[in-house]
């Protein structure tokens, strides 16, 4: 089965190049980031359980830090106050349109902010807040982000196209991550791999290599974590059959909270098996 077949089909259907499509500005643009988050909270209601009421604020990264920080991030609040819930946007990334929309979904609803307050509402043992479950946390945010591509403009395939592109990029970076830190690829081997995929600019190849070398297994948290949630959802669908409800599935996953994926799978599958 060709994993990029849907991606190629959309390209043929629209009769456009990938570059032209991704640079298109025909998608709606939101100027108010807090309004985007409010819109997302309404859009997720059919697919995700209700989130506890909370306050949040969208802020900009200080100009002195823009070149050194991520395009966006959610600042996890102290466990004893659960506030403030701040999402920071880096203006240096110059995000807008679909990119900004899906980024706020990743960091806000139904991503990090939503998952954090939902887990806290279950009154977990405090020690669980100390356990760094990066695969669950970043995997959930990436999985949740994928829904925003459909919410953004549901009447077209634009969102599906963009998500496939995002997924392929994460896959490529994850393969490089594994190649470098597990198989021992050097910069020349990575350059060959990237060239085979059409990335031939040596400066870009070097930059990608350096980013991955400095942060081992980072991309795996996002991409493999997301795939774990997608696989778990598929297995739950097969067990539940026509009785499967996506909202209930997400409720089970959120109630269990951040943990190792074998633990999560056992708990979720057991609930469907019984």
Identify what each model region corresponds to.
Residues 1-274:
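N-terminal maturation segment of proteins
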